[in-house]
Amino acid sequence: MIRSFKTLILLCLFNSILEAGSLTVMTLNVDNLFDTFDDQKKDDKAFLPIEKKNSETHVIQCNRIRVLKWRNECLYLDWNQETKNAKLTNLAKNIISYNQDGADVIALQEIENMYILNELFLLLKPYGYIDISLLESKDRRGIDTAFISKYEISNPKLHYIKFKSKNRDTRPIFEVDIRINNKVIKFYNLHFPSNFYPIDMRIDSLDVLNELIKKHNYPSVALGDFNISSKDDKKYQIYKNQEKYWYVGHRERCNACKGTYYYAGDKTWSYLDTILVEKNRNLHFINTSINVWRTPFNSYIKSGKPISFDPISNAGVSDHLAMVAKLKFN
């Protein structure tokens, strides 16, 4: 009996040591998380309470939007406190459903500002989260990348990309340091140009990322919305080409996964979102942990397609699914 008890203690200690050398990460494009205030420096006119949308100026600006869905959002979406709070609650529920208390480090895309990020943080704080980080970028729409972490975040930086083409995109790469078990890890949060823009802009963005990691020897993780469609990936072998520098999450192992985003137009799945771990820096995936995070409230059971947030029913989370993984120090 005593021997069995000692064995159990040793097993628990061994597991604790293993856990101490690992961390979990999540990346999620939250699909337009805005507050309810009108920020004159940002294009947030679609995400305002309906009573703020009655002016002639607002209607004229909305009618200039070419995409019907976005134009209707601008004109008719009632983004009030109740709707905003429902979106926050659903996001928090989605995040916490992973491992019952969320990943250690979360990279988020499409966050308007620190104010709304802090509201989400307050919902997550009881689950061990202690720090957040967001730097306001020059993005024309006013959506930024952000981190929420169970470890302290330091040295936040934005790296803007100079594109070879004439097209301009203002979303930078967001870099932070996070110290875990006395080791600094560089995290890079990405939201690359959308598929509206040519593929060379996403390739330029990856080139900038790869130059950044050459400037230091820290373990590095890059995660976020790469906006690389399955069509472009197949044609240009983009993710495969990154394996010179990185372990690419969904290429390492995600056998039962379809992708993180579903294109209804051509009925295809894509890994717009993924996680990269830099090679040869004593950090690697636990391959069996790599997954696209699905729950009954963030995706349809049969098809697996994401359930976007519906401001009428207040159901759903995002048009993207999160990718998650567990990482381990060598």
Can you say where each PLM-predicted feature lies in the sequence?
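Stable alpha-helical elements in mature extracytoplasmic
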Residues: K87, L91, N113-I116, D144, ...
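Solvent-exposed loop/turn segments at secondary-structure junctions
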Residues: V30-F34, I111-Y115, S137-R141, E152-S154, ...
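Classical Sec-dependent N-terminal signal peptides that target proteins to the secretory pathway
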Residues: M1-A20
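Structured beta-strand-rich core segments of catalytic domains in phosphoester-bond hydrolases
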Residues: V105-V184
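Second-shell loop/turn segments in exported
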Residues: C74-K84, D101-L108, L134-L135, K164, ...
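Extracytoplasmic, non-cytosolic globular domains
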Residues: D44, I106, L134, K164, ...
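Metal-dependent phosphoester-hydrolase catalytic domains
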Residues: T24, E211-V221, I228-N330
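N-terminal, active-site-proximal structural segment of metallo-dependent hydrolase catalytic domains
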Residues: L18-L123, S137
